[in-house]
């Protein structure tokens, strides 16, 4: 099949993104957001199923129902918090869900979810010394860290008994309000763009394929995980026939990185190690041949769904496509142009064949038959005598 760019419904992308951001979904409390994604897929005529652990899977069938497939992986869970302790002053001590700095939590408005499903308590994260008129310069001199902040509850409460009367207890989930904003210049500012912007891009790509009446060359599975931020990610739920996995997640826009907010990113490696040589270069070729603005990058303090998949034993090539995000896990910002480039690349990838459609039909094969695209293909005559590099 010859690949062709598809029409991207940017209004749909924007709407889905804003609606996703409006649904609180810290890791461990993701039922609502998964229901939303399932409803969006159902509206496209794509059925979905849910695993015991909450991951959602769906499928765009290719022309064949056997052999090797591919998978796109995103996650709907976000960083957040949990009530660790009720404090004597009527405030709450927090434990983080996921890895993020208290520096970006100070001043954040939050929702506290009690076991009473009809009651959500609001509050705000504040430093322990929050009053400038009381502490003066000590406000700036206090440390930065979760031990230096607390949640002020928006109810008339001054002690532990008052908190318990509100139904608040240790283990209650605390969601940080995203405060999304789309600017006239196309920037999207919000907490939790990681990875809800990725989910919106993937849903938009699937919509473009369905609207165009295109049958993917290879059966394409979608796996929406709910524990990426706490390290489990795609450790389960992948179809055993999957030969290629592409994770879609936030790319790092910061000094020393090549990612941009207005472009898609191809990660060549992250904190776990390099991604698959052949799959990454195939994605780069697709982007280059079809005018997708794609930059390559390598991340240091980074881990994604595919790391969990590989560690769980997935027999698949893995890659990571991203949308550039400034201030990741903080006051995040990306751009609609970058999301559009990412969505288009996903549309093209869904139309393409596997890197090695015949060889990857099985999890393993004969070394001599491997059609390597690398610069050092296997020598069919066998290993040379003596140390490598010495004639």
Tell what function each PLM region has.
Residues 1-391:
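N-terminal hydrophobic/helix-forming segments and targeting peptides
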């Amino acid at each position: 099949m010859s690949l062709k760019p598809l029409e991207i419904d940017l209004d749909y992308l924007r709407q889905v993104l804003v609606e996703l951001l409006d649904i609180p979904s810290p890791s461990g409390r993701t039922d609502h957001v998964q229901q939303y994604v399932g409803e969006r897929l159902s509206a496209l005529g794509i059925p979905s199923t849910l695993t015991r652990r909450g991951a959602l899977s769906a499928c765009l069938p290719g022309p064949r129902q056997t052999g090797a497939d591919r998978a796109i992986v995103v996650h709907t869970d976000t960083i957040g918090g949990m009530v660790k302790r009720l404090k004597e002053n009527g405030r709450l001590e927090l434990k983080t869900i996921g890895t993020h700095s208290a520096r970006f939590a100070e001043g954040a408005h939050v929702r506290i979810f009690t076991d009473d499903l009809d009651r959500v308590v609001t509050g705000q994260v504040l430093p322990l010394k929050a009053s400038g008129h009381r502490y003066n310069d000590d406000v700036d001199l206090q440390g930065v860290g979760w031990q230096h902040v607390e949640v002020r509850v928006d109810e008339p409460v001054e002690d532990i008994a008052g908190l318990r009367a509100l139904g608040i207890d240790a283990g209650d989930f605390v969601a940080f309000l995203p405060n999304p904003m789309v600017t006239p210049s196309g920037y999207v500012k919000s907490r939790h763009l990681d990875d809800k912007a990725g989910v919106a891009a993937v849903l938009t790509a699937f919509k473009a394929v369905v609207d165009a009446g295109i049958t993917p060359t290879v059966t394409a599975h979608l796996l929406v995980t709910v524990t990426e931020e706490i390290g489990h990610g795609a450790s389960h739920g992948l179809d055993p026939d999957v030969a290629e996995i592409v994770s879609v997640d936030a790319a790092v826009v910061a000094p020393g990185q090549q990612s941009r907010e207005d472009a898609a990113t191809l990660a060549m490696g992250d904190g776990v190690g390099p991604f698959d040589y052949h799959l990454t270069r195939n994605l780069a070729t697709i982007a280059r041949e079809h005018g997708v603005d794609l930059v390559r990058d390598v991340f240091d303090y980074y881990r994604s769904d595919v790391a969990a998949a590989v560690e769980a034993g997935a027999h698949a090539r893995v890659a990571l496509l991203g949308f550039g995000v400034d201030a990741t896990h903080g006051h995040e910002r990306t751009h609609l142009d970058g999301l559009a480039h990412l969505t288009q690349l996903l549309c093209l990838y869904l139309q393409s064949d596997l890197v090695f459609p015949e060889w990857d039909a099985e999890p393993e094969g004969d070394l001599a038959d491997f059609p390597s695209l690398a610069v050092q293909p296997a020598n069919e005559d066998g290993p040379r005598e003596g140390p490598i590099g010495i004639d």
